[in-house]
Amino acid sequence: MSGYILAIDQGTTSTRSMLFDRNMRVVGLGQQEFTQHFPSSGWVEHDAEEIWKSVQSTIRIALAQAGISAADVAAIGITNQRETTVVWDRISGKPVHRAIVWQDRRTAQFCDELKRRNLEPLFTEKTGLLLDPYFSGTKLAWLLNHVPGLRERAQKGQVCFGTIDSWLIYKLTGGKAHVTDATNASRTLIYHIGENRWDDELLDILGIPAAMLPEVKDCAADFGMTDPALFGVSIPILGVAGDQQTAVIGNACFEPGMMKSTYGTGCFALLNTGTDRVTSSNRLLTTIAYRLDGVTTYALEGSIFIAGAAVQWLRDEMGFISVVSEVSALAEKADPNQRIYLVPAFTGLGAPYWDAEARGAIFGLTRGTGRAEFARAALESVAYQTFDLLEAMQGDWKGATNHTVLRVDGGMVASDWTMQRLADILNAPVDRPVFLETTVLGAAWLAASRAGIWPDRKGFSERWQRDCRFEPAMPEKERESAIAGWRDSVSRCLTRPQ
């Protein structure tokens, strides 16, 4: 049987390739970790060539596991870690420097300088983003300023810039395609998300030559054909989007007002705002959720730095649990009369506070506080932080009503206790899907729908399956008291008034 779909999920610490059949079932999986480089404090780099090798390797593993050949693959979809910045020689295809990862903070001073020049409102108006080292633009400017001769080569069109998706497409097509999609472009700090174009004014401010930029396409489009020298046949690449955006798609959040939240080490929540490009007054990001058939759908995005990492802290630093899976059962044993708050500002606080200097703290300790209370506080901190995001989104956009249903994915959502507490604090239903790998599923759908093998948006939404819906059950007075305690705790950790 042909008609298989290959989805490549290139993440921050590992690469996965997953094969789906016509019925959207997983039939093959390859996964491989790669090296993290930390050349200086706050710097994070990846070897783009190592990432490319991991993609080739995991594709071959997935094909072997499925027992099929590349000739049986109808289309490829790609999803990727966003913002990570690669520059390579247009002819040789060799990177000029290691990739600068989204986590890298080396351009913090440059961002501060741009803020002092009062340029952040301009960037936000055009890109929906904040002036932060997180995004690609200042990383690319750093490379142009620090790699000898790079600026001159860029001006002559001799080098290419791209996010990871663009780099992989270039390599997969044997150097024939230098392209990206609208979602990845929207994370660069140089793309006008209202006019869907690279912005000359922002390029000029950052000193970036337009000649090095990729062509921007819809998320489901013809991105090129794989070089037959790689797998013996040419396979069309038909779907591309950043990882948080494919999670929106994989959760079938196609209607305005639908919201997804991915819980891993951190948390990323995106609220579909339809064709409304909402400007946040709460320092949330405005981003492109997806662009299909030339129509741009926008989202409000909020990021939480510490979610599952709080549980890892209980295990690794505190020694309260041996394995992460123990935490829910331990939290259930906590004394209900104790209300302990953990503000996990281990690396500052993200949206909507954006306080990089805030530090973590624990409030409400008594002589009877033990491991169980710490476990409950760690899990509850995820719910409270999600509440902060939802409240900010509801303040920014009238479509984010109190009737919002949150669809969740990621490692933490396997815990029934955590999901129930999330529903209680949000006072909103929480839906957990049957298939939790929504990021890679979204990439597969983009390619498969373009190929005409999987159903369209309506059909895909109808096939989305819910494993469990968690309905809010906490009495309102108890909920209000709990949230008031959280707000008080956070206020004590902030370094500047909100």
Curated annotation (Swiss-Prot):
Glycerol binds at residues 82-83, 134, 243-244. GO terms for cellular component: cytosol. Keywords: ATP-binding, Glycerol metabolism, Kinase, Nucleotide-binding, Transferase. This is Glycerol kinase. It comes from the Bacteria. Gene3D superfamilies: 3.30.420.40. ADP binds at residues 12, 16, 265, 308, 411. GO terms for molecular function: ATP binding; glycerol kinase activity. Belongs to the FGGY kinase family. It is an enzyme of class 2 (transferase). Coiled coil: none annotated. It catalyses: glycerol + ATP = sn-glycerol 3-phosphate + ADP + H(+). Pathway: Polyol metabolism; glycerol degradation via glycerol kinase pathway; sn-glycerol 3-phosphate from glycerol: step 1/1. InterPro entries: ATPase_NBD, Carb_kinase_FGGY, Carb_kinase_FGGY_CS, FGGY_C, FGGY_N, Glycerol_kin. Its EC number is 2.7.1.30. One of its GO terms (biological process) is glycerol metabolic process. Sn-glycerol 3-phosphate binds at residues 12, 82-83, 134, 243. Transmembrane segments: none annotated. Key enzyme in the regulation of glycerol uptake and metabolism. Catalyzes the phosphorylation of glycerol to yield sn-glycerol 3-phosphate. NCBIfam families: glycerol_kin, PRK00047.1. ATP binds at residues 12-14, 265, 308, 312, 411. Inhibited by fructose 1,6-bisphosphate (FBP).
